[in-house]
């Protein structure tokens, strides 16, 4: 009711007398556009659609396809880079394990070499000590023989002097040398004399 009053008030303002049924019919006719207008709108829509399709949709679709290809190539590159990095990581780990084995071998070889050198120096020191002991023993034996010889000479000379005094006669040099020679050739140890 309020709309019909409003319609009436509009018609009164304009100065024309319009009935409510005329107004409703006019509005009802305005709901359906005219066929030429509808056809022109449809043709304009088709033209705009085709223009948008060829000038906007296809380039956008190509750009989207290129973007998808770029993204896919980036994904493929990242997958390949990941695989490469995993391969390099496993290779580095294998090299680390190998270098660890080599370092253990080097340490073990160094230990065994050090033990061999230590044993060599120990054996050399023992042989040098034994050689020194033998040389010292030989030297002691030679000195003992020298001492025994000198002692025999001294004893022979002393005995000759004592014999001369006892006999109060002079022994000739040849007799003295003969007695000393016999005494020196005697192999009886000094302790037994």
Swiss-Prot record:
Pfam families: ATP-synt_B (PF00430). GO terms for molecular function: proton-transporting ATP synthase activity, rotational mechanism; proton-transporting ATPase activity, rotational mechanism. It is found in: Cell membrane. It comes from the Bacteria. The chain crosses the membrane at residues 35-55. Its main location: membrane. The keyword Transmembrane helix applies. InterPro entries: ATP_synth_B-like_membr_sf, ATP_synth_b/b'su_bac/chlpt, ATP_synth_F0_bsu_bac, ATP_synthase_B_chain. The keyword Cell membrane applies. Keywords: ATP synthesis, Cell membrane, CF(0), Hydrogen ion transport, Ion transport, Membrane, Transmembrane, Transmembrane helix, Transport. It is a single-pass membrane protein. GO terms for cellular component: plasma membrane; proton-transporting ATP synthase complex. Belongs to the ATPase B chain family. F-type ATPases have 2 components, F(1) - the catalytic core - and F(0) - the membrane proton channel. F(1) has five subunits: alpha(3), beta(3), gamma(1), delta(1), epsilon(1). F(0) has three main subunits: a(1), b(2) and c(10-14). The alpha and beta chains form an alternating ring which encloses part of the gamma chain. F(1) is attached to F(0) by a central stalk formed by the gamma and epsilon chains, while a peripheral stalk is formed by the delta and b chains. HAMAP family: ATP_synth_b_bprime. F(1)F(0) ATP synthase produces ATP from ADP in the presence of a proton or sodium gradient. F-type ATPases consist of two structural domains, F(1) containing the extramembraneous catalytic core and F(0) containing the membrane proton channel, linked together by a central stalk and a peripheral stalk. During catalysis, ATP synthesis in the catalytic domain of F(1) is coupled via a rotary mechanism of the central stalk subunits to proton translocation. Component of the F(0) channel, it forms part of the peripheral stalk, linking F(1) to F(0). This is ATP synthase subunit b. It comes from Mycoplasmopsis synoviae (strain 53) (Mycoplasma synoviae).
């Amino acid at each position: 009711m309020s709309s019909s009053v409003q319609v009436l008030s509009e018609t009164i303002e304009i100065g024309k007398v319009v009935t409510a049924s005329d107004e409703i019919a006019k509005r009802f006719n305005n709901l359906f556009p005219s066929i030429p207008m509808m056809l022109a709108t449809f043709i304009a829509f088709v033209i705009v659609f085709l223009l948008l399709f060829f000038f906007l949709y296809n380039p956008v679709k190509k750009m989207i396809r290129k973007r998808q290809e770029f993204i896919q190539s980036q994904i493929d590159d990242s997958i390949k880079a990941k695989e490469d990095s995993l391969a390099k990581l496993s290779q580095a780990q294998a090299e680390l394990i190998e270098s660890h084995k080599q370092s253990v071998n080097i340490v073990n070889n160094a230990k065994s070499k050090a033990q061999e050198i230590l044993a060599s120096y120990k054996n050399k020191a023992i042989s040098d000590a034994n050689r020194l002991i033998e040389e010292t023993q030989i030297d002691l034996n030679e000195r003992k023989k020298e001492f025994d010889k000198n002692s025999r000479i001294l004893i022979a000379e002393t005995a000759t002097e004592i014999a001369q005094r006892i006999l109060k006669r002079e022994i000739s040099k040849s007799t003295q040398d003969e007695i000393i020679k016999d005494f020196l050739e005697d192999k009886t140890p000094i302790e037994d004399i």
